[in-house]
């Protein structure tokens, strides 16, 4: 029977494979059904056919093309006209359907027209007869004519084509030239260039027959807003740009020019395929100057906006001009079809793009920054500088924007920010936004900024976790035999493939049943590396006691009493599923003879026993007999060592690095295992007597089991309480990782069981402290378990026979908890070694020197003494604990004051002995309480240490005592800060108070005599530690640390002696900072000897000396003339003097008690006034820094004028002198400043109200200098001065006035006009200038 030739589409339709028509035609280049003979199965699978579809295709192929010699002979004898020889398909491009609907639509359309669409035409057949073309409908109108859809009947094929009708009137070249160009166009074969089938020569028009693109042009698709979300996303546009560049690169290699590259000439064939059309059409039609230069109108669509300047000016079309057009095409794509240079005429476009003042299109909102950079390169004015298509094609793959996936929702939408949800895909447009945010675009086309930290990288191509079906496309099984039962292989060396376990350890499905087998050990395991209990068990407990979630309570409560098996079987216990270790992430419960167990992957990860080197594994409830044979004694039965020898609870962890055994070992038979179990149980129960109190323990054990059963919700359970655990998998339940908190009742029961186990233990805890190597466990030693010790990381057994004696019935301290709180007091006490013996002779000597003599050394307790705080001091007797200990907490201010008053009442004098520091108060630093500095109090001469006396070594502070750190180092001036005037006032007031107190004391009656011959020394910032610690002059003493003598410590008092007004206005920290600088910067001796510094010291010394003289002579402070003292100081001196004369002794002490913080008066009132003055001299003896300064100061003092000396010497006798006038005041100030070449801080404070204002200084004022710096060359000092005087010396407004005049210089605004203009716009300079002359800012 003969079969006629069948069309490819009809053949596929009959085979029900019509959906593969486009793929067969374009990918496999099959044009008729007979060519399926040469298509291999791999080729068909490549285009998506499944095996059943391939078999169906072969079946219908055999039907239409049987393999018989008769058919071959007939085929050879057929007419040549019916067998059209085809040549190879173009370019190997792939055109796949958009989806099933569009593919079926294309197929139905092809079936309707009864034609297929071959991608190849006969060679040299670019002239097509007019009668072979049938026009169906018009698709649109182009610049060169109309475009229609039709069918080309080529022999036995019908091809759907697009027909472009060109009017002869539009053609400016003769038909022969056009045919030459058409022949060139016909020879182009590329996957991204539309194929030209041929040309139809009609009488009135020319028709170009090309491929038909069902999805219209790219420009139409871009303008369709509905396609933005589903189709034309940014990644798709980037892929289209690469395909367009690929086609243009092909033309560039062929030395061909397109001349009209634009989005309207890019045709979309599928969701991922575009092709360039109308190649060379303008040249074929002979379009010349008129088309390009005279078609200037507002509605211009072609092609001025796409042409390079040289094309418009000189009609010079090159590949560089195509590159320019490619840049414009990219701009169209990323602007979604927006017309370039919209609303501009051709002449305006030429003016905009032509040099020298050329402009360029702005970056579209959805355009990635890299692509816009490429556009700017394509729009280089110099054609030679534009990149070539080959270079662009190499760059484009690396320019694709990165895609990110949002992991959180955008909760707070902001302006210009993306509003995205979790799971949205964001394409990055720009990373360099100048902000922490990136610019991106969603798949919806919305652009904005987003936080990149809320996203992760999105990779396409990764397999989805929610697959609808299990795909086996990659399986290349060639055999067509059906799958039969005998073809399913038996387990080969392993159960992995039956348990959904791959060779690499990857699993899917439920593999819990694998873990229930005792003999199968190849379930993948993983050691949890971030947490290793064996490494930090000594530092940190796994769980906080007394929670029963640790395995110790489990073992003691449920698994360590073999007598619980009433029927002779192995004792089966049910375990509460909440008993999982804290380090487990995914616990797997393995049923072992009815016993739930956790398995450690290796002994090194088990915190409850020492590491074992052997591979022998034993289950505690297998009850090995006395013969020593183990049912699992074969080596290699399990590749990991057992965590606890008799512990039935294995901590099972997943491990990737374990190597499975080479051969599957099923172990002994089930019958042998049961017999061995029975034998071991009978041997165990018959050979050992019951221990005392066993019944009580057993009852408690049963109660625990019952409570565990009641609380159990998930996990591997077994209810055969009496030990009928013969088949381990019969009572197994599905493993689960859920955790249920243990109830309070169960917790109490378990804790009670632990206490009972501790009470009946026959072993002492003292053995646990001894260092011993762990013994390899043997099968004979049943139920041997030990407490691990924190210092030992586990414990072994000293005697090998313990496992066979009473330990089988009475667990030897079955609590394996690593926590000390699990022990009772006796056990805890016995487990602690004798610290007295551990310390030794050297440690005891160090203890005595550091602890007992700490009053001298002033340190906290040693580490050994710290440890003693946790123990009973009755255990040992250290010989020097009789000394009174320093309190661990800071004493209160009230207690401190009471102690000091008691000392003063008893007339105590402090000496440098060992106990002098025990009752000393801990003072808070001054910066914690107040900002006023108390001048160093005078010290008794008998308390000053000898200069050659050794300085005690400072040691670390007491542990547990919160040390208040000193203030952080602040900005330090280059030159020392002179003590300001208010610091002077505080100093003088303290001296006055001290004089009052000294006058009150009966022991210092000789101290009232003045010291006129005392040399004037620098006492401004002298630190008392110079007297006490001459070897450490730079040590700072205003920390909260105990000192040798309280009198020698710096004290920073509150402003108790000042009036509220003084306290409010004079509380600065300048003097404090000066002292810190003096103490810290000991390397500035050269600077301190400079005239500036010595003058400052001199000035302050003069003030202090005269004040002392005036105070001792009982003169009014206001009569001190010629000195640099401000009004506030004079007023305060009056207050202090009146207080001294009018207030009795009792009122002074009452005044002190009124303040919240006492002044901590030193116990120096019993010392003579002579010693007070002499101690000031001794203050400088130990300070090397001030020694060097003293000489310079004294030299400066000797150089002072005779007039000032006489002025100061006349003060004591000038009690009746008149108050100083202002003229005298300024004269004295000028005289002082004449001899000084420094300006100190007090100068600035004093003359802050008296210095000349900026208006008085004129051009030299600071305001003018600032304005000149701000305005630069735009203004002069005189002009700035005029603006300042006009605006009443407001610098900011003056600057705006001059800037406004500069910005609107054409208007020649006056200051008045500028002021009014700025006033109207609320002094907004930019707005004012813009309103005045339209200036763009």
From Swiss-Prot:
The modification Phosphoserine is found at residues 71, 764, 778, 831, 918, 924. Residues 399-460 form the SH3 domain. Gene3D superfamilies: SH3 Domains, Transferase(Phosphotransferase) domain 1. Disruption phenotype: RNAi-mediated knockdown results in a low frequency of dorsal defects in the developing embryo. RNAi-mediated knockdown does not rescue the small eye phenotypes induced by hid and rpr overexpression. Simultaneous knockdown of Ack and Ack-like results in many embryos failing to properly secrete the cuticle likely due to the loss of zip expression. Mutants also display defects in the dorsal surface including holes in the cuticle and germband retraction failure. This is Activated Cdc42 kinase-like. Belongs to the protein kinase superfamily. Tyr protein kinase family. Residues 947-957 have a biased composition (Pro residues). Residues 805-815 have a biased composition (Polar residues). The active site is at residue 260. The lineage of its organism: Eukaryota, Metazoa, Ecdysozoa, Arthropoda, Hexapoda.
């Amino acid at each position: 029977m003969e079969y006629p030739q069948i069309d490819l589409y009809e053949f596929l339709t009959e085979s029900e494979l019509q959906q593969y028509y486009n793929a067969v035609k374009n990918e496999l280049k099959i044009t008729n059904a007979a060519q399926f003979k040469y298509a291999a199965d791999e080729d068909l699978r490549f285009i998506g056919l499944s095996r059943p579809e391939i078999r169906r295709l072969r079946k219908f192929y055999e039907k239409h093309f049987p393999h018989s010699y008769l058919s071959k002979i007939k085929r050879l004898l057929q007419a040549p006209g019916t067998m059209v020889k085809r040549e190879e398909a173009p370019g190997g491009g792939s055109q796949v359907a958009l989806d099933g609907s569009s593919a079926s639509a294309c197929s139905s359309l092809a079936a309707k027209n009864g034609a297929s669409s071959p991608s190849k035409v006969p060679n040299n057949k670019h002239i097509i007869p007019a009668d072979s073309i049938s026009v169906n409908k018009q698709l649109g109108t182009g610049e060169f004519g109309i475009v229609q859809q039709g069918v080309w009947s080529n022999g036995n094929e019908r091809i759907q084509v697009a027909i472009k009708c060109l009017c002869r009137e539009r053609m400016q070249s003769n038909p022969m030239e056009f045919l030459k160009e058409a022949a060139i166009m016909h020879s182009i074969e590329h996957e991204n260039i539309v194929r030209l089938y041929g040309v139809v020569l009609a009488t009135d028009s020319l028709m170009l027959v090309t491929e038909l693109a069902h999805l219209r042009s790219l420009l139409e698709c871009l303008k369709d807003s509905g396609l933005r979300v589903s189709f034309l996303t940014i990644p798709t546009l980037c892929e289209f740009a690469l395909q367009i560049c690929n086609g243009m690169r092909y033309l560039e290699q062929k030395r061909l020019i397109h001349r009209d590259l634009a989005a309207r000439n890019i045709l979309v064939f599928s969701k991922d395929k575009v092709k360039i059309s109308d190649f060379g059409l303008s040249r074929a039609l002979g379009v010349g100057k008129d088309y390009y230069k005279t078609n200037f109108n507002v509605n211009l669509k072609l092609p001025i906006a796409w042409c390079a300047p040289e094309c418009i000016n000189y009609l010079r079309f090159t590949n560089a001009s195509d590159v320019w057009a490619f840049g414009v095409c990219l701009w169209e794509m990323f602007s979604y079809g927006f017309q370039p240079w919209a609303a501009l005429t051709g002449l305006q476009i030429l003016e905009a793009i032509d040099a020298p003042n050329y402009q360029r299109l702005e970056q579209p909102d959805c355009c990635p920054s890299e692509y816009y950079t490429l556009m700017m390169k394509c729009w280089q004015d110099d054609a030679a500088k534009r990149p070539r298509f080959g270079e662009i094609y190499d760059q484009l793959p690396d320019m694709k924007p990165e895609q990110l996936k949002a992991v959180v929702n955008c909760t707070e939408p902001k302006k210009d920010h993306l509003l995205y949800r979790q799971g949205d895909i964001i394409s990055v447009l720009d990373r360099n936004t100048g902000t922490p945010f990136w610019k991106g675009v969603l798949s919806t086309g919305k652009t904005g900024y987003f936080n990149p930290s809320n996203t992760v990288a999105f990779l396409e191509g990764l397999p989805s976790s929610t697959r609808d079906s299990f795909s086996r496309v990659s399986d290349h099984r060639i055999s067509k035999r059906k799958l039969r039962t005998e073809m399913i292989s038996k387990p080969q060396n392993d159960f992995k493939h039956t348990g959904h376990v791959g060779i690499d350890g990857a699993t899917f499905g439920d593999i819990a049943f694998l873990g229930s087998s005792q003999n199968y050990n190849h379930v993948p395991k993983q050691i949890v590396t971030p947490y290793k209990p064996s490494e930090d068990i000594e530092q940190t407990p796994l769980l906080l006691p007394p929670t029963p979630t640790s395995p110790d309570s489990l073992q003691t409560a449920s698994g360590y009493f073999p007598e619980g098996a009433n029927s002779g079987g192995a004792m089966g216990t049910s375990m509460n599923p909440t008993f999982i270790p804290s380090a487990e992430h995914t616990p797997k419960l393995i049923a072992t003879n009815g016993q739930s167990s956790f398995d450690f992957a290796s002994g090194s990860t088990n915190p409850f026993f020492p590491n074992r080197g052997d591979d022998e594994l034993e289950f505690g409830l297998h009850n090995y007999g006395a013969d020593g044979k183990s049912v699992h004694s074969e080596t290699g039965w399990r590749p990991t060592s057992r965590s606890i020898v008799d512990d039935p609870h294995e901590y099972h962890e997943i491990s990737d690095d374990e190597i499975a055994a080479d051969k599957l070992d099923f172990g002994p038979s089930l019958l042998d295992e049961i017999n061995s179990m029975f034998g071991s149980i009978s041997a165990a129960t018959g050979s050992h007597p019951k221990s005392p109190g066993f019944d009580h323990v057993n009852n408690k054990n049963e109660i625990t089991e019952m409570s565990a059963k009641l609380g159990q919700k998930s996990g591997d359970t077994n209810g055969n309480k009496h030990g009928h655990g013969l088949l381990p998998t019969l009572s197994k339940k599905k493993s689960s990782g859920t955790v249920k908190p243990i109830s309070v009742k169960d917790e109490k029961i378990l804790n009670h069981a632990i206490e009972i186990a501790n009470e009946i233990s026959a072993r002492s805890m003292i053995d646990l402290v001894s260092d011993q190597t762990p013994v390899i466990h043997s099968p004979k030693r049943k139920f041997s378990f030990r407490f691990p010790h924190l210092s030992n990381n586990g414990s072994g057994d000293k005697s090998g026979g313990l496992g066979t004696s009473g330990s089988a019935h009475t667990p030897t301290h079955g609590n394996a908890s690593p926590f000390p709180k699990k022990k009772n007091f006796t056990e805890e006490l016995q487990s602690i070694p004798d610290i007295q013996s551990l310390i030794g002779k050297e440690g005891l000597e160090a203890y005595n020197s550091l602890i007992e003599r700490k009053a001298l050394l002033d340190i906290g307790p040693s580490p050994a003494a710290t440890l003693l705080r946790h123990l009973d001091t009755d255990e040992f007797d250290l010989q020097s604990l009789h000394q009174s200990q320093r309190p661990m907490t800071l004493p209160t201010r009230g207690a401190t004051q009471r102690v000091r008053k008691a000392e003063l009442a008893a007339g105590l004098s402090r000496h440098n002995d060992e106990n002098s520091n025990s009752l000393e108060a801990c003072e808070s630093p001054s910066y914690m309480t107040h900002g006023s500095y108390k001048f160093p109090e005078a010290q008794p001469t008998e308390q000053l240490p000898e200069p050659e006396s050794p300085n005690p070594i400072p040691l670390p502070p007491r542990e547990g005592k919160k040390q208040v750190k000193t203030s952080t180092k602040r900005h330090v001036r280059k030159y020392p800060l002179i003590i300001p005037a208010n610091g002077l006032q505080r100093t003088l007031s303290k001296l006055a108070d001290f004089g009052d107190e000294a006058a009150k004391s009966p022991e210092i009656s000789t101290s009232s005599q003045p010291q006129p011959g005392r040399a004037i020394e620098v006492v401004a910032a002298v630190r008392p530690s110079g007297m006490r610690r001459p070897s450490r002059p730079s040590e700072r003493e205003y920390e909260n640390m105990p000192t040798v003598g309280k009198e020698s410590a710096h004290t920073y008092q509150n402003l108790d002696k000042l009036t509220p007004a003084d306290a409010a206005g004079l509380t600065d920290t300048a003097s404090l900072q000066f002292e810190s600088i003096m103490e810290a910067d000991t390397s500035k001796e050269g600077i301190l000897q400079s005239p500036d510094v010595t003058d400052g010291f001199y000035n302050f010394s003069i003030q202090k000396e005269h004040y002392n003289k005036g105070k001792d002579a009982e003169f009014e402070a206001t009569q001190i003339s010629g000195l640099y003292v401000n009004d506030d100081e004079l007023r305060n001196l009056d207050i202090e003097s009146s207080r001294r004369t009018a207030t009795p002794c009792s009122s002074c002490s009452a005044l002190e008690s009124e303040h919240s913080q006492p002044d901590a008066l030193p116990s120096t009132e019993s010392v003579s006034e002579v010693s007070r003055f002499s101690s000031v001299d001794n203050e400088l003896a130990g300070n090397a820094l001030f020694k060097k300064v003293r000489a310079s100061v004294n030299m400066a003092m000797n150089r002072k004028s005779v007039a000032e000396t006489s002025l100061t010497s006349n003060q004591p006798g000038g009690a009746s002198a008149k108050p100083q006038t202002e003229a005298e005041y300024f004269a004295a100030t000028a005289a002082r400043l004449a001899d000084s070449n420094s300006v100190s801080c007090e100068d600035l404070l004093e003359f802050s109200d008296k210095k000349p204002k900026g208006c008085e200084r004129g051009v030299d004022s600071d305001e003018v200098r600032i304005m000149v710096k701000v305005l630069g060359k735009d203004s002069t000092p005189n002009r700035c001065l005029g603006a300042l005087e006009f605006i009443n010396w407001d610098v900011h407004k003056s600057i705006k006035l001059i800037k406004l005049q500069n910005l609107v210089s054409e208007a020649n605004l006056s200051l008045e006009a500028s002021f009014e203009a700025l006033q109207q716009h609320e002094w907004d300079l930019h707005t004012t200038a813009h309103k005045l002359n339209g200036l763009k800012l």
